């Protein structure tokens, strides 16, 4: 059985409206936007044009500190990425489920923190759509 590791929603917002809404909603929920990667622009610069795609990196220092105290290698999966992209003319918002991290670090005991972060991240994308 395949483990669910992501959630994707479709929105009627334009691409730019969705990116801006994610940034605003993340701040409202206590997360800081660390960086927005314009993947489409980067690929286009290298000769690989594609439909719009940005990755919004968000982080909550309290939660990050808690999981990193358990295992520094969890940093490989931080910060929380939220992707906004266009496929088939529709704007989509996707995120990796933070609880999926627990499968990679079962001894870390981060299930409770991961569940709290996941609840908030899912609220961010649902309230943004």
Where do the protein language model's features map onto the residues?
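Well-ordered alpha/beta subsegment
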Residues: 104-129
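Compact, glycine-rich, soluble single-domain proteins
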Residues: 34, 38-83
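Residues that cap or initiate secondary-structure elements
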Residues: 13-15, 62-64, 88-90, 99
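Short acidic, gly/pro-rich beta-turn/loop elements at beta-sheet edges
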Residues: 19, 66, 103-105
